[in-house]
A protein has these predicted regions:
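Binuclear metal-dependent hydrolase catalytic cores
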Residues: 1-69, 135-153
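Short, glycine/serine-rich, charged loops/turns that create anion-binding
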Residues: 7, 53, 73, 95, ...
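Binuclear metal-ion centers of metallo-dependent hydrolases, dominated by the metallo-beta-lactamase
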Residues: 76-88, 93-153
């Protein structure tokens, strides 16, 4: 299944009809399910909330003491408080400076200092980030991620 907020369902069904409804020689191969603020997948409880990604909203996911936020520009209201008491936060850092739809390094570090996760790993990084420089300025519990990385939660 593909989980998504209610406001995205029509757009996805229209833009990608062949995936969800089938079309011509395509059989449907995915089912849309509405994403609520809390979903249960098998035995796993997943909390979700929207955050801003420039001109659109995307989701942060929290599973126990782990959370994942990519394409993050800013949080709404007090939603950042939902990220307290994390063991691990994986968060997107597109580049060092601000971008119209992504927070820059300084803003992400501000978020980290506020929520105080035990460990943070950056993802969704571009080649514009110098890995050595990034590693040298990251706090001791903050690390750039890498392709193929295996993370135990």
């Amino acid at each position: 299944p593909a989980y998504m907020p209610k406001d995205m369902i029509f757009e996805m069904e229209t833009s990608y009809k062949y995936i969800f409804k089938g079309e011509k020689d395509y059989l449907p191969f995915m089912e849309i399910r509405e994403l609520h603020s809390s979903i249960k997948f098998q035995n796993i409880n997943i909390e979700t909330f929207k955050h801003n990604h420039g001109s659109i909203d995307v989701q942060t996911y929290r599973i126990g003491n782990f959370a994942y936020s990519t394409d993050l520009k800013k949080f709404y209201d007090n939603d950042i408080d939902k990220l307290r008491n994390l063991d691990l936060w994986i968060v997107g850092l597109l580049r060092d400076d601000e971008h119209p739809s992504h927070a820059g390094y300084d803003k992400i570090i501000e978020y980290i200092n506020y929520i105080k996760p035990k460990k943070t790993i950056f993802t969704h990084m571009t080649a514009l980030l110098d890995e050595k420089l990034l590693k040298s300025k990251c706090p001791k519990n903050v690390f750039p991620g890498y392709d193929g990385q295996i993370i135990e939660i």
